[in-house]
């Protein structure tokens, strides 16, 4: 008896399908938020696929499609509700934007940083090496004469840190950044630079 009264009260206290509040407020909000979530997941999934993170991408793909099926079912059930269309389209646009922001914040994978300097290439390479980056330097020839080309493969989340080091040496240096789709991560994991490695070796010798 108590349970029946409870359900009766809930029926009048919570908006149900057919109620204007449910049809024009709650349902569109649900569609919008679900669409934002599934499109954000989809954006990250595509980026993970390009970086060969297959397991994570497959798991995200499952969640993405599951949410999409739930949302599209509600849209089809309410074809006469224009607010559902607006929520669906708005959620798609917002989800794409949020997905790109999340991907930038997560900064998954590695990048190739290429620096071309006519005068300060050796100094830039030394500073990056001292900071713990693996650096390769080679001679090149530009339209205005000889240049030094500095390469380093690093985690994407450390690009800003590396660029501060580079621009402290040469603020207007020319550089380019490319995605490194596949790397030998054991080679490019964080490691001490030349200066720090020398200090570490001395400490170990003292302890011995």
UniProtKB/Swiss-Prot annotation:
It is a multi-pass membrane protein. It comes from the Bacteria. The chain crosses the membrane at residues 56-76, 82-102. Coiled coil: none annotated. One of its GO terms (cellular component) is plasma membrane. Keywords: Cell membrane, Membrane, Transmembrane, Transmembrane helix. It is found in: Cell membrane. InterPro entries: DUF2179, DUF5698, N-reg_PII/ATP_PRibTrfase_C, UPF0316. Belongs to the UPF0316 family. This is UPF0316 protein LIC_12973. The lineage of its organism: Bacteria, Pseudomonadati, Spirochaetota, Spirochaetia, Leptospirales.
């Amino acid at each position: 008896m108590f349970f029946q009264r409870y359900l009766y009260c809930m029926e009048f206290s919570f908006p149900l399908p057919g109620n204007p509040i449910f049809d024009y407020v709650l349902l569109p909000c649900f569609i919008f938020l679900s669409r934002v979530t599934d499109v954000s997941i989809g954006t990250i999934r595509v980026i993970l696929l390009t970086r060969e993170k297959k397991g994570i991408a497959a798991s995200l793909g499952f969640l993405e499609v599951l949410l999409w099926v739930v949302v599209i079912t509600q849209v089809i059930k309410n074809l006469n509700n224009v607010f559902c269309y607006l929520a669906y389209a708005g959620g798609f646009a917002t989800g794409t934007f949020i997905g790109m922001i999340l991907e930038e914040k997560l900064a998954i994978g590695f990048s190739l940083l290429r620096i071309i300097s006519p005068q300060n290439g050796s100094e830039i390479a030394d500073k990056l090496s001292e900071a713990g980056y693996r650096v390769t330097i080679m001679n090149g020839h530009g339209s205005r004469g000889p240049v030094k080309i500095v390469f380093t493969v690093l985690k994407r989340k450390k690009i800003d840190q590396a660029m501060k080091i580079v621009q402290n040496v040469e603020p207007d240096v020319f550089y380019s950044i490319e995605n490194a789709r596949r790397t030998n991560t054991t080679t490019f994991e964080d490691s001490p630079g030349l200066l720090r490695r020398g200090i570490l070796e001395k400490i170990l010798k003292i302890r011995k």
